Structure formats: C-alpha cells, structure tokens
Amino acid sequence: MQTIKAILNKGEWLPKALKRLGYDMIPSNCILDKTLTGLGATSCEIEAKRNSIIIEPNVPVILGKLNSYDNIEAVYQKCTPYNIKAYLKLDKKYKKIMTTPESFEKIRKAAKELGINIYEEFFCLYDECEKTTQDIDYRRSITKPIHDFFAFKDKAMVSATPLDMSHTKFEEQGFTKIKIVPNYDYRKPLTLIVTNSYYKRIKQTLDGLKDSKKICIFFNVTDGIADLIDNLDITDYKVFCSEKSAKKLIKRGINNAYSEITYPLARVNFFTCRFYSALDITNYDGVKPDIIMLTDLRTANWTMIDPFTEAIQIQGRFRKRGDEEATYNSLTHISTINPDIKVRSKEEIGIKVEQFIKNHETLQKQHNNANNDMKKEAISEDLKNLKYEDLLDDKGEINPFAIDNLQNEERVHAYYKSAENLYQAYQRAGIFKVTLNNVTECVGEDDIERLNQAKLAIEQRKLIVENLANIDKWFTNGRISFEEKEKYRTLLKKIPEFQYTINAYDKIGKDAIVSAEYKKKIIDRKVREFDKSEDYQKRNSSEIKNLIKEAFPLNEYLNKNIIKQKIMDIYYQNGIMSKVTQNTIKSYFECKESGKINSFKLIKFKY
C-alpha cells in the first residue's frame, strides 16, 4: 500500500495537513494515520459538506459527540428503526449518523425501506480502525459492517494508531495510507515501572501523588479495580466501565460505577478498555490529571497495554483547552512481566489456522456422510465448538481481521517477556520520552503470593525451585550479597513444601528436580542416589581415611563393636549416613579375626 505523507505544523488541526495534499475533506479509499490523537478527524467529518456515516467502536464516544453537535443521529442498541427513518426523512442538507458496528445494519435496513442508497449517497468513516483487529477475539460483531464498508463508493478508515490489516479489499480497491507527520517534537514523558511487587508499587505511586487533585487509572479488570478501591481504602472515586460491569461492581459495594462519563470527575477515576480510545475527556475542572496505566499479568493477559496503540490512545483522551500544550501532569505505566509467556511466530500461527481448517473439513465430511440424524446432530454441535468458528465472519467466510488478531496478540505478548522488551517497544512507538524504572526484586511480593495461592504440592515445588534458582542467579551475578541471598531464602520458609524442596534443591539442583517433573517419588529416588554417591566419595576421601587410620592402633585385638562405633562417630561428624558393618572395617584395614573373642586385630591400613 502506498504511503503519502502530510506535514502538520505545531498548533494545526487535521484539515490543514489534508489541504497541503489538496484535500478539503478526508479523501476516499484511504487509511488515515493521524499519528497524534485529538487532531479533530471525527469533527472534520461531522463538519464536512457531505452525508456521513461514522462507525465508532463504543457508545461513550458517540454520546460525547452528541454533547458537542446537535445535528447528529446516534445509532446504538437503544436506538429504534423509527428514529433512524425519521432522521433520514429530515430536510437537512447534510446528514450525520454515528453508529456502533453492531447497529450499522439498522441504518442499512431503514435506508433500504426508504429507497435510499447509502453506498452512493453517504461517505463512510470507520473510526479507531485498529479496534477491528484488537477486539475481534472477544467481540466478533465489531467487524460486522466490514462488507458494507467496502461497498461504499466513498469511504476511509482513520486512527492515530492503525494496525496493519491483511484484508484483500484494501489492495483490490486501491487504498492508500495518508501518514500525518508533525514537524515538531511531539513526544510526551512517560515513566515505565516494571515490578514483581505490584500492589506495593501502586501504593508508592499513589502516595507520591497525594497532592494530586485528579488521578485517572486505566485498568481493564473490574474485579481488580474493586480490589484496589478496597485494599487502598479509596473513597473519592468513580469507575467507568460497561453497563454489565457497572452492575457487577455495584453488587460488590462499589457504588460509584457508571457506563457513561459523568462529570465532575472524582479525585480517583478508573477506566476500563471501552474508554481507552476515541472518547474526549474535556471537563476536568481546569485541573490536569495524573494518568496511571496498569498491567497485572497475575490477573489476566488482557491487562496488557500495547505501547503502539492503547498507551497512545489513553494519553490522548484528555483534550487541549485553549493554547495549553500539556493536557496532564504525569503519565505512568506500572506493569508486571512474564518471562515464560509463550510467543508464537507468524509461521506458527499459520500452521495453527491450517489445522483449524483441516479439523473443520474432517468433521464437515463426517457430517455430510452421516446416515443417522443423531450422528448429524452430534457432529453439528462439535462443529459449532471448533476454534475455526471464531475465525468466521457473518457470511461464513474466514475473517482476515480474526487472523490479524491472532498475530497482533503474539506481537504484544512479546513485549511483556521482559522489562527491556517493553521499554524498547515504547521507544519504537515514537510518541513517548520513556524513563524505565525497573524495580523487579529477586523475590517480590507477587512471587510470594503465587506460592501461597498454589494449592498442589507439586505446583509449590515448581515455584520454590524457580525462586531458589533465581536467588542463586542473582547472587552469582553479584546483584545480591550472601546475607541478602539468605534473607530471600528465609522469605520462602512459610511455604509448606519449602523444607523438603530446598533440601532436595541443595543436593541435586534445579535440573534434576525439573527432570523429575517435581514428583516426590522420583525426587526422593534421585536424592537417595545422590546421598549414596556423596557418602561413597566422602568415605573414600583422604580426610576420612586419615581420621580412621589415626583412630586405631595396629596389631592389637580390639572389640568389633568398639571399632564400628568409632567409625560411626567419624562418619556422623562428617555427615556420612552409611551404615558401618564388619565389611566396612575390612574395607579400611587388613584384619585378623580372633577365634575366642568378638574382636579384630588390625594388621595394616590399606591406603
């Protein structure tokens, strides 16, 4: 796809940049990459001298524009066909309709009944187009109007953070990308805190903002938000989330939960992902907020924030007022990481998709060949539950956005394997001046919490071994002292499986326990083998041999039990657990046995 660059000077809005390319309005068949949020793309289309249908990802965005413009028809779940028809019949020069993807078909049906060809008479703008890729895994309906979109004579997609899209129609219809290029330094400061003591770092950050009058926290788990409110005893708060989540929070006693933005904002405001993009937050009482983004991989992978899209969109929610440059005081991302997270390549995803298709074809063939209604019914049920079904659009065809979503997820997962990966992703995004504060501890509060939550002994052993190995690694690399090493080991002592596991770990090491699959029976066998080998080496060491040699006079008859006891004492003092028998005595000395008394004459030491 060809990319055309449009220069944007400081203080200018989107129409100025487009005019430099010779456009008075957003041109057709383009993906408009704004680079920056808040350039007025939606307003540009609302004010354009043509009929427009603007597809927005979420309702709050639409409601926000309704407060600014009185000529818009909002179409979403609550909207009736009657209202749409009434609006389309109005004698207005330019009609402006904003809709969610799910409600687009209401417009199509209403227009058809009125004999209006929307594909010829309206311009279609798909706003925040990256959401078609990002959200389709849990919201398949977000791409519902995509076939309609490509049917429009005039259309465009727009976002400050568009993702690459593989749909063949972009190529077939000759789409170009218009890239807005600001000719000034537009980067914003961002502090990235990477931690394995999640709550501790949040509390420290909030304590550092005790004088802040407005704090806005973006976190995509409502239960996690409720936990923060409860655990940190936050009283002056508001939570903005879906209607379903708001009801759930209210049942839990989190009463200030809303599905739409309500003003004034509280001192501490929480936002879930439906408020990450497109929405304009303008009324914050002249007080610039401090923004905190949270990623807690202990809770869920969907708390990951993409530095290339969501982080940019989040900071862009707060709109300029007048000539002010900064719209917030500070921007912080507090995140955990997971070095063990699996990241699949594009090729591996391709193999998976191919197998999904083959699985479907196999079952479909069985269904077609089944000679029994019950068999057909059973196979039909299995067909509906195949992963393949998640890849289909409403026409039963493979949805390219579903494939893009699989690849996009792996891209973001890769950032969260390490603090460095996440930092570099933010650097490459180009929007932020990033300060990395990696406060990962050798053993953090999150590590202890995982251990305490592990219910199975085998799971506890696995986590203990991982922590012990990490402690040793930090000590070997000089990151902690011996005293700190012992302190971290002590932190693990309260875990039921600790003593057993550390005894085994100190003897046979991590690799042997891993190869035993953390199973007690196999670990015990390996420990016994180790002890036996260790005892043998100690018994035959020059130190032990010398101690035994010096313990007995030669050429005197000595009671066998006395000899055995002395050797046992030497063994015990040196950590040797082997039994002592007459053969043990004979292994060290040439002996002559007395025929009358239970004794040996030690003739010669063998070594």
Task: Give names to the regions the model predicted.
Residues T35-E47, V61-I62, K85-L88, F104-I116, ...:
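SF2 helicase motor core recognition
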Residues T37, A41-C79, L163-S166, V221-D223:
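Conserved Walker A/P-loop ATP-binding site and its immediately adjacent core
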Residues E45-A48, V353-Y607:
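The feature captures the C-terminal accessory region of ATP-dependent helicases
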Residues N51-K65, M98-T100, I202-L232:
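Conserved strand-helix element at the start of the C-terminal RecA-like helicase core
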Residues P101-F104, K112-F149, D154:
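SF2 helicase catalytic motif II
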Residues T161-G208:
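Interdomain hinge/linker at the junction between the two RecA-like core domains of SF2 helicases
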Residues L297-T327:
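Conserved SF2 helicase motif VI
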